[in-house]
Amino acid sequence: MSLIECKNINRYFGSGENRVHILKDISLSIEKGDFVAIIGQSGSGKSTLMNILGCLDTAGSGSYRIDGIETAKMQPDELAALRRERFGFIFQRYNLLSSLTARDNVALPAVYMGAGGKERSARADKLLQDLGLASKEGNKPSELSGGQQQRVSIARALMNGGEIIFADEPTGALDTASGKNVMEIIHKLHEAGHTVIMVTHDPGIAANANRVIEIRDGEIISDTSKNPEIPASNVGRIQEKASWSFYYDQFVEAFRMSVQAVLAHKMRSLLTMLGIIIGIASVVSVVALGNGSQKKILEDISSIGTNTISIFPGRGFGDRRSGRIKTLTIDDAKIIAKQSYVASATPMTSSGGTLTYRNTDLTASLYGVGEQYFDVRGLKLETGRLFDENDVKEDAQVVVIDQNVKDKLFADSDPLGKTILFRKRPLTVIGVMKKDENAFGNSDVLMLWSPYTTVMHQITGESHTNSITVKIKDNANTQVAEKGLTDLLKARHGTEDFFMNNSDSIRQIVESTTGTMKLLISSIALISLVVGGIGVMNIMLVSVTERTKEIGIRMAIGARRGNILQQFLIEAVLICVIGGLVGVGLSAAVSLVFNHFVTDFPMDISAMSVIGAVACSTGIGIAFGFMPANKAAKLNPIDALAQD
């Protein structure tokens, strides 16, 4: 069985009236160890034939077999495996990647074989040393002469073994001395057992081969052998490995090339990132503002008590009948306090009136409350003491004042122990409350607190309360507790002549409302992310066009479609992730400035918003980078190589 068998190979370019028949019923066979020169003038079809033999192109019709296996039935990745594992290409224009060193160019085919980094470097250095380039391992192609570049190309062809060497005009771009040196190397490869297929238009170069096939106008006109072929020897090559290092090395190579591509066009990359930066910064900042405002509001709610339910007479706030409803009593509060899910219950009654101290008269509000009220409402004592259970039981004529009362009446003296008059009733000051920065309502109101028994018995003369504040136990569900209290009071009153205000319900409403606002504003900010994503897609399409030749080179040395897809996808994701991180940093800087000048509520950047931003930018990179990457992966190797 011949190594290569072609039967009736035809190749057409163009269509319709412009269709050109390039190869016409080409049939030939090549044995292992042959050195074949395909000669012909420009346009004869010799390069097209070599491209088909090297699986860079496909025939329009006919059969092409390697070791008896029909290539026409192979998938793109199977053809890539042939190029990677058995073929080595020597191009007229060298086709080295300009961004890589000589060592890296030579080692590149082994990346797609899954060879480890040390193994790749050692083999590449050995090949370069054998070809007289030991001192040029770290040089880039632009730092090498034409002959040196071609020797690097030869070393690359041998990296994975190069059982079959395809040489396309290997001396065409070289001076006479360099061309002679390259042909000597090719002779040595043949003598070492490599099958060599060389394309040339020069009869002198073709004379080096032991078999010459001449093509004219797409047809073989002669096939002569002047020397018997050398018996083939086994050509050693790197074996493909299926291990974690296989995928790791390919990822590292793809990532490195992506970084180089981004850095090669710094300004373009920055402008591409700009849409992502603005979008991510907007989203993170909006979420931070939402978190800060929500946190501030919830702190304000906490200032009036957490896990609390307030019970009022009437059907709701603003009910004109509520003042005539007098069924909410101290007994209700006592019964409520005995429920298993209740931590405490304190009634509250209030009265407005004139507050007098010495010759000063002020309008103030006096609240009659229980001893637990201050703890339930989260009020803090600045000085003195709070009234206790005994004070409540004994109708003690004591009062706790707020900071406003202290400032108005006792600006220059200690209020503790002083007696003030409220509606002409004497009350002894026993404590002063701290100013409540988070309190709702008018902060200028003068407020006093006394035992509810004192207020009801000595000031208002009423037996009902204005409200009852209930503290629910931490392990109890406030919604269930609210229903239980409703059922209890309905049973006691015979009707539902009261309504409740659940602090947790307010919290839920605030969280829901701020969440909706954050979502709405974030949706608007996401538009800039979409615009940024379109910019990434556009620039990646440009990158694919600019690097089409590079894609062709990688495919020629064995890159799978998945390798090409991975490389360009990583590049898109890299741009977006960097943009996302810069956007997060920008948002953090904005929050620092904002928090310095605005003290009412902070911008609160959460870890989840940062993680979400990075995940979002990664998702955009994948979503908008896939189409350009997929376009690159589906390029035909020979079409890609033909691009300048």
Swiss-Prot record:
Q: Where is the ABC transporter domain?
A: 4-242
Residue stretches spanning the membrane: 270-290, 524-544, 574-594, 607-627
Could you say which EC number(s) this protein's record lists? 7.6.2.-
Its membrane topology, per UniProt? Multi-pass membrane protein
Which superkingdom does the taxonomy of this entry point to? Bacteria
Taken from the UniProt entry, a GO cellular component term is: plasma membrane
PROSITE patterns in the cross-refs: ABC_TRANSPORTER_1, ABC_TRANSPORTER_2, MACB
- Pfam families hit by this protein: ABC_tran, FtsX, MacB_PCD
Q: Which family does it belong to?
A: Belongs to the ABC transporter superfamily. Macrolide exporter (TC 3.A.1.122) family.
Q: What is this protein called?
A: Macrolide export ATP-binding/permease protein MacB
**Species, as recorded:** Neisseria meningitidis serogroup A / serotype 4A (strain DSM 15465 / Z2491)
